[in-house]
Amino acid sequence: MKKAIILLTLVMCSSTMNAQWWGSKKVNGNGNMVTDTRNTSSYDEVTLVGSIDVQIIPGTEGKLKVEAESNLQEYILTEVKDGKLKISVEKDVSLNPSRNMTIRVTVPVETINSLYLTGSGDISNTGILKAKELKIGVTGSGDIDLNVEARELWGSITGSGDIRLNGKAQDFKCKVTGSGDFQVYASRSLKARVSGSGDISYKGNPEKQDFKTAGSGDISRN
């Protein structure tokens, strides 16, 4: 009897520890796709955390469109704090959409200063994203693919993610740490750094060029 109690206690402790380490809830999609419109305050920065697709479109800020299966909607968080929009999944919850279904959030912007992606999601846009100054960053394996016109651009990749920027920028500073790839355009100046096996390819003929590599990565004109 004592052995049985001890064994049961060990199993319960193990289950508790596993729940803490690996997340406590996995939710499978039910196949019923729905669209939820969410109202927020305005924002000039967008951060995506997790495996979600985000589409940036021109429009009035504060009216987001969230496309997902009905039983997943409640776990998708869209919060604005201090002018920063964060799109994420509820803590300790793992969402598993049905086959051929994805979670997509459409984000209208008037002006934007920063776009950040952490995880395996994707960020893209329709039209041309115009900004005087714009910061873009990927941490993880996600991808950012944008049409951009900016005076100054800063970009960074940490991990295996990719950033592809079509359009024009006068001055560009970019950095890759890891195995990610960067595709950029710069007309006046380009400062590029690669640490690891990642690559930076650029278009344009910037007058000022400052390149440094450490590792097997490469910086080249496309």
Tell me what each language-model feature is:
Residues 1-222:
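Intrinsically disordered, low-complexity terminal regions
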